[in-house]
């Protein structure tokens, strides 16, 4: 297989990274895609950095063994915990990682008040603190950890009463602070954008990084002459949890029925 025809490997703690996978498919339709959901260990946001690094190394090895030409770490928490180590582990492999959209949010806010929804792990990370120091010194940032929200999305409950009640409670402090810009600091959260739109004023800008990651992947592949052309192979999916559970959720979050393999690492 020519290097440019090799697939791109994408992984996340669960199904949240499918929001990034959708953006990659839309921008780079010729790329063949591999996706790993580490659902048996979700959410990463409540795990130790060492634990997350070990999981990311195992999954990275798995995807490279299946011919991935590049890796996309489609998880903010995993990026904070493991991106630097993965780049050292795979020095020849392009790695695109996630981080909360602090820079574009700081540029977009009109009143200087920005809210952040993210996992505890992301909000406590040195990487997030560095982003605030670098890009948000002139704005006020109000952070809100979101325990339980990833689990609701993993269950496919994007519009139900329990998810609505949880989001209302999580959004309360941010709305009270008068934020006019909201960062979705977890790849799971774009799936509840329609529900968010019902719960916040229409003039609040909601920012996530999925499209930016797809653009960065395009730049990285182009620089290394690895952009695919022609017909992409069908995407392949694996989960560390029950394949039938992910097969149930894929039509909701990905838009089509797919077969899912079992990840045993």
UniProtKB/Swiss-Prot annotation:
Catalytic activity: L-glutamate = D-glutamate
InterPro entries: Asp/Glu/hydantoin_racemase, Asp/Glu_race, Asp/Glu_racemase_AS_1, Asp/Glu_racemase_AS_2, Glu_race
Binding positions for substrate per the UniProt entry: 12-13, 44-45, 76-77, 187-188
Active site per UniProt: 75, 186
Keywords tagged on the record: Cell shape, Cell wall biogenesis/degradation, Isomerase, Peptidoglycan synthesis
Keyword NADP (UniProt): no
EC number: 5.1.1.3
Coiled-coil segments: none
An annotated Gene Ontology molecular function: glutamate racemase activity
One annotated GO biological process: cell wall organization
Highest taxon of the lineage: Bacteria
Pathway assignment: Cell wall biogenesis; peptidoglycan biosynthesis
Function (record text): Provides the (R)-glutamate required for cell wall biosynthesis.
Family assignment from sequence similarity: Belongs to the aspartate/glutamate racemases family.
Name assigned to this protein: Glutamate racemase
The species this protein was found in: Pseudomonas paraeruginosa (strain DSM 24068 / PA7) (Pseudomonas aeruginosa (strain PA7))
């Amino acid at each position: 297989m020519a290097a440019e025809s090799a697939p791109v490997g994408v992984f996340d703690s669960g199904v949240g990274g499918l929001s990034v996978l959708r953006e990659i498919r839309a921008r780079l339709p010729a790329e063949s895609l591999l996706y790993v959901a580490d659902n048996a260990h979700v959410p990463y946001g409540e795990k130790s950095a060492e634990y997350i690094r070990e999981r990311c190394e195992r999954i990275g090895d798995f995807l490279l063994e299946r011919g991935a030409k590049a890796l996309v770490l489609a998880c903010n928490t995993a990026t904070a915990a493991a991106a630097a180590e993965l780049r050292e582990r795979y020095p020849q492999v392009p790695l695109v990682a996630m981080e909360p959209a602090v820079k574009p949010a700081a540029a977009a806010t009109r009143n200087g008040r920005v809210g952040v929804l993210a996992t505890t792990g992301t909000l406590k990370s040195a990487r997030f603190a560095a982003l605030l120091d670098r890009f948000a010194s002139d704005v006020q940032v109000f952070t809100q950890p979101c325990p339980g929200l990833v689990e609701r999305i993993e269950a496919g409950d994007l519009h139900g009463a329990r998810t609505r009640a949880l989001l209302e409670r999580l959004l309360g402090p941010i709305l009270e602070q008068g934020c006019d810009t909201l960062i979705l600091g977890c790849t799971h959260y774009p799936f509840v954008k329609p529900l968010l739109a019902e719960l916040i004023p229409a003039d609040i800008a909601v920012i996530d990084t999925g499209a930016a990651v797809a653009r960065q992947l395009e730049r990285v592949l182009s620089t290394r002459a690895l952009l695919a052309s022609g017909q992409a192979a069908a995407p392949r999916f694996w989960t560390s949890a029950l394949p039938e559970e992910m097969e149930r959720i894929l039509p909701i979050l990905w838009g089509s029925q797919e077969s899912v393999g079992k990840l045993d690492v």
